[in-house]
Design a protein with these regions (language model features):
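Loop-to-helix element that buttresses phosphate recognition and phosphoryl-transfer chemistry
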Residues: 3-59, 109-121
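Generic beta-sheet signal
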Residues: 5, 133-142
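Short active-site segment of divalent metal-dependent hydrolases/proteases
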Residues: 13, 143-144
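Phosphate-coordination/substrate-recognition cap region in phosphate-metabolizing enzymes
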Residues: 36-95
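Glycine-rich phosphate-binding loop signature in dinucleotide/nucleotide-binding domains
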Residues: 42-44, 128-133
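A polyampholytic, Gly/Pro-enriched intrinsically disordered region
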Residues: 87-101, 178-188
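Short glycine/proline- and acidic residue-enriched helix-loop micro-motifs
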Residues: 96-116
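Domain-level recognition of soluble alpha/beta enzyme cores
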Residues: 155-180
Length: 188
């Protein structure tokens, strides 16, 4: 049985614009409008899941979707870095930031290691391998990156290679035994 999975990164927040590690913050006004514009493309889902954060709940609302919330789709826990800018962390904790970026099994901020995010997301993907139908998952850039590297069987160290923007849409399909990335083209 074929399963289609559509990943949607939440809309833009102040943290996105200001290059900060996010808190549980709302979408900005422009993000709500942009999200509503893509809603017609996502109305035909058999199952909808979302991270329980405010920004993903607001994205789901703007899309007109009613998700089941899953902690497995939550953003990385950035520990004491939450709410702080990357520039600030670079200035105050350059060694810790470098370690976190280079060694995915480390969490010098006291939160969650990138490797732990990848393990969590891989388990969620595995549970839906044979689900069938169309699944929509509204989540965060870190979760979508983890899903991509899991699908490609890439090492966790490649986590930073994918750049996921707000409202990015990533498609995957499963034939029941493995996930594949799916790139859509324009239809004639």
């Amino acid at each position: 049985m074929m399963t289609r999975l559509t990943w949607i990164c939440h809309g833009s927040t102040a943290a996105n614009r200001e290059a900060r590690f996010p808190l549980d913050e709302p979408l900005n006004e422009k993000a709500v409008i942009a999200t509503q514009a893509i809603a017609p493309r996502l109305r035909h889902a058999d199952n909808v899941f979302a991270s329980p954060t405010l920004r993903t709940r607001q994205t789901a609302d703007a899309l007109g979707l009613q998700p089941a919330f899953s902690d497995a789709l939550a953003d990385c826990d950035f520990g004491r870095w939450a709410g702080r800018s990357i520039a600030e962390i670079q200035q105050l904790e350059p060694e810790n930031l470098a370690a976190w970026m280079a060694r995915p099994e480390e969490a010098p901020h006291g939160g969650e290691a990138i490797a732990a995010v990848c393990t969590r997301v891989n388990a969620w993907l595995s549970q839906r391998l044979q689900a069938g139908g169309h699944i929509v998952a509204i989540t965060h850039a870190a979760v979508i990156r983890a899903a991509i590297i899991s699908t490609l069987n890439a090492p966790v160290a490649s986590f930073w290679i994918a750049d996921i923007e707000p409202l990015a849409i990533v498609h995957m399909t499963s034939n029941g035994s493995r996930w594949s990335l799916r790139v859509e083209g324009a239809t004639a």
